[in-house]
Amino acid sequence: MRGKKPHKELKLSVPAQETPVDKFLTASGTFKDGELRLNQRGLQLISEETADEPQSTNLKVEDVQLSMDDLEMIQVIGKGSGGIVQLVRHKWVGTLYALKGIQMNIQEAVRKQIVQELKINQATQNAHIVLCHQSFYHNGVIYLVLEYMDRGSLADIIKQVKTILEPYLAVLCKQVLEGLLYLHHERHVIHRDIKPSNLLVNRKGEVKITDFGVSAVLASSMGQRDTFVGTYNYMAPERISGSSYDYKSDIWSLGLVILECAIGRFPYIPSEGEGWLSFYELLEAIVDQPPPSAPADQFSPEFCAFISSCIQKDPAERMSASELLNHPFIKKFEDKDLDLRILVESLEPPMNISE
């Protein structure tokens, strides 16, 4: 396998030249892109049919539009698609938020991702999706005021516990599947970047999907995409090979994530234990090799079957989010009164913040 070229060449492009941010600013300092308007007063979408008569669709989660003057910066907690994420506190009421700031001196592809993320966050209201309270534009930066998930990501949890037991995996997976069901069937969104660091957890044991910077909206639940974006480790074979793909690509990614949580390592391992020579070699393995599976001598038949239902190279053979919610593995633990709080409360939080 060493020295071989990828099974199918990737079409890599040179980054586009940056577009002056002034191109997207009105005289009043409002960021504009198509139907989207964003300024210090918040976000507004203008439908193409009524472009001459703007109608605000202001978010209703907060009673008063936030600004930078209302927020106290505490510390950087991560990097999302195209931006830095900081933990901030509302100066007057003490509420903690995750504030994602995105610089706008800007390549066209990045700008499109940002606009897409804003639109998806504006429209999404679900218990298993990280809530975007508000967004605003300030001094060349777009800010998203996001729900703060105080126990970090699934990646943080894996670092501490190494592996997660089946009962907790079932509870965790059910929550993610409910979020995916909402995205796929109600919002017609393919997330395209399901991975441990994009699944966040709070002290109540709630698991929520975040980071829509590379998500795609389809015209209907039967649509397909053919673009190459997302984190390659968890990318479905049909996406790597340049084929059209749909919602089932998220199911592949979820299957790899859950299997990784169970076995304590990324499911694809290099030959001869030497490590992957390059990410092209890993992509080739995902396309050419048989899909990984859960060891039958270590896990229940229900769990093994669940993983197999997710990690099928042929997307037509993968179950949908709706079907997986009725899988025997998920149903097996539904009446056990399991609570992820038991797991997360036993772990060190990613940071200690006095509220």
Curated annotation (Swiss-Prot):
Q: Which keywords are on file for this protein? A: ATP-binding, Kinase, Nucleotide-binding, Phosphoprotein, Serine/threonine-protein kinase, Transferase
What is the catalytic activity of this protein?
A: L-seryl-[protein] + ATP = O-phospho-L-seryl-[protein] + ADP + H(+); L-threonyl-[protein] + ATP = O-phospho-L-threonyl-[protein] + ADP + H(+); L-tyrosyl-[protein] + ATP = O-phospho-L-tyrosyl-[protein] + ADP + H(+)
Tell me the CDD domains matching this sequence.
Answer: PKc_MAPKK_plant_like
Q: Which residues carry this modification: Phosphothreonine?
A: 227
Q: Which cysteine-cysteine pairs are annotated as disulfide bonds in the entry?
A: none
Top-rank lineage group of the source organism: Eukaryota
GO biological process annotations for this chain's record?
defense response to oomycetes; lateral root formation; male meiosis cytokinesis
PROSITE patterns from the entry?
Answer: PROTEIN_KINASE_ATP, PROTEIN_KINASE_DOM, PROTEIN_KINASE_ST
- GO molecular function (one): mitogen-activated protein kinase binding
- Please verify whether the record's keywords include Nucleotide-binding: yes
Residues binding ATP: 77-85, 100
Q: Is Transmembrane helix there in the keyword field? A: no
Cross-referenced SUPFAM superfamilies = Protein kinase-like (PK-like)
Task: Check the record and name the InterPro entries matching this protein.
Answer: Kinase-like_dom_sf, Prot_kinase_dom, Protein_kinase_ATP_BS, Ser/Thr_kinase_AS
Enumerate the spans annotated as Protein kinase domain: 71-330
| Annotated positions of the Phosphoserine modification | 221
**Enzyme Commission (EC) number:** 2.7.12.2
Activity regulation: Activated through serine and threonine phosphorylation.
Q: Name one Pfam family in it.
A: Pkinase
According to its UniProt record, in which tissues is this protein expressed? Expressed in roots, leaf sheaths and panicles.
- Active site, renumbered: 193 (proton acceptor)
Q: Which GO terms describe its cellular component?
A: cytoplasm; phragmoplast
* Enzyme class at the top of the EC tree: transferase
Q: Which family does it belong to?
A: Belongs to the protein kinase superfamily. Ser/Thr protein kinase family.
Under what name is this protein listed? Mitogen-activated protein kinase kinase 1
Which species does this protein come from? Answer: Oryza sativa subsp. japonica (Rice)
Q: Which gene encodes it?
A: MKK1
